Amino acid sequence: FFTQEVVDAMIYAGDHHLDVVNMSFFADPWLFNCKNDADQRAIVTAISRASRYAQQRGVVMVAAQGNEAIDLAHPVTDEISPDFPPGSELTREVGNNCVVLPNELPGVVGVTGIGPSGELSFFSSYGAGVTDVTAPSGSSGQAPNPFGRVLAAWSSTGPPIDLPGRDVQDAGGAVYAWVQGTSMASPHAAGVAALIRAAHPSMSAGAVQATLQNTAMPKDCPTPAETDPLSGALGVQTCTGGPGHTNFYGKGLVDALAAGSG
């Protein structure tokens, strides 16, 4: 989704006082928007204002961390954008003046993904100060298919879909498919936030976020803290943080029972 569509959707959410919004996307065309670039700085400003507008009207904003296996607290390169027009991708250096939208915006709940083994999914991005909670996203290397993936709704309307390695039914209407990605994780967290809102309709957006995090099941860093899930293909991922909060898992795994009954 490009800037105008993202801004319009956030303003709509605020105007209609939606309870929870899930955002399983990054704002096209840039994975990282860098504030030293005038055009990208304008994108950051516009989407930040729209997000703040929605939050001020009680909307709980939840976002996927992304599937690039990047430490968002220490980004180095962006190799996948701009993603439009197709084929225009370039490799560029990025730093902490560059952010992924919308998940690095203030007040947005950032969600990483874990696989069936309970470990960080091999593709999940993460980062200190960015990761708030974690949720199931699938991770095909941790269990045989289809159990290494998540059964999720999938629209098959529009042009034919060809996704290597994914079981997608090419038929009219909505179907289900075994997929993986932090796009599967953030809806779990958004669903738990919705349970909190249902149990406490007058609770503020900030209080819902706090409850979501404080009722999560804590997850410590793995031993060893450095992992190399794809033997160098994605680089080494290093878990940092102490008991109760890490850059891999934030406050921990979302807990629907604890959150809904709290």
Model-derived segments and their meaning:
Residues 59, 87-198, 247, 254-258:
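Extracellular S/T/G-rich loop segment that most often corresponds to the catalytic His/Ser-adjacent loop
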Residues 46, 187-191, 207, 211:
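Short amphipathic alpha-helical segments
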Residues 26-29, 113-116, 216:
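Flexible loop residues that form catalytic
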Residues 69-84, 140-151, 157-160, 218-228:
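Internal, charge-rich low-complexity segments
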Residues 30, 70, 117-120, 159, ...:
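Flexible, glycine-rich phosphate/dinucleotide-binding loops
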Residues 1-105, 170-188, 199-202, 243-246:
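Substrate-binding/access-modulating region of protease and related hydrolase catalytic domains
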Residues 18-25, 198-262:
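C-terminal subdomain of the subtilisin-like protease fold in secreted/lumenal serine endopeptidases
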